[in-house]
Design a protein with these regions (language model features):
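Positively charged, low-complexity intrinsically disordered regions
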Residues: 6-7, 19, 23-25
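Bacterial N-terminal signal peptides
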Residues: 10-18
Length: 191
């Protein structure tokens, strides 16, 4: 009886492991967040870029590398270049989509607006609004087609608390009037 149980257990385990090799994802999303100028020490931007490249070898898969904010500030590399070096690294790594986190504003809105067009994958935010025009500062989302016509939307949402967790004067004009907002309200309905 013991042989029979062991046999079936080993067989089930082998079949389960065999199935793992056949798992296929049509849309692969690699995600970073709060890296503050550097992907974790165990990985690094170079290895992240290589991982994306390796995944892209499967022609059936669409691979997207996305960042959910706080990438360009936090270490001397970012501070000394006011974010430029990290944007350059993100381009080499192949980022496809980024959301401005509260620390993307640490060099001021004007600086972020200088850096944003340089990020090949683009910055996206559905709720960072120029209050003078009522329009979003960045595109709100990015559509990605995969698997012969399926679509996925990557939607950028910057935390409305950025207005107070960053430096409020960065979002004001010379007269102290807010010229940028985050569709903030107590209910979240403005998003």
């Amino acid at each position: 009886m013991a042989f029979s149980r062991r046999y079936w257990l080993v067989l089930a385990l082998c079949l389960a492991l065999q199935g793992l090799g056949q798992v296929r994802a049509d849309l692969v999303v690699l995600h970073t967040n709060d890296v503050h100028c550097g992907v974790e020490n165990q990985l690094g931007y170079a290895q992240l870029a290589q991982y994306k490249k390796d995944l892209m070898k499967n022609p059936d898969d669409t691979v997207q590398l996305v960042d959910a904010g706080d990438a360009i500030q936090g270490e001397p590399l970012g501070s000394l270049t006011r974010g430029q070096a990290v944007i350059d690294i993100m381009n080499v790594a192949g980022y496809d989509f980024a959301i401005p986190g509260n620390h993307e504003f640490d060099y001021g809105v004007a600086r972020l607006l200088e850096l944003a067009p340089q990020l090949a994958g683009g910055y996206y935010s559905c709720n960072l609004v120029d209050l003078r025009t009522g329009k979003t500062v960045f595109p709100p989302y990015k559509m990605v087609a995969y698997d012969g016509g399926k679509k996925a939307a990557f939607i950028g949402v910057t935390t409305p608390q950025t207005l107070i967790s960053s430096t409020p004067r960065y979002f004001q004009d010379d007269k102290g009037q807010f010229i940028y907002g985050f569709s903030e309200d107590a209910t979240g309905q403005k998003l």
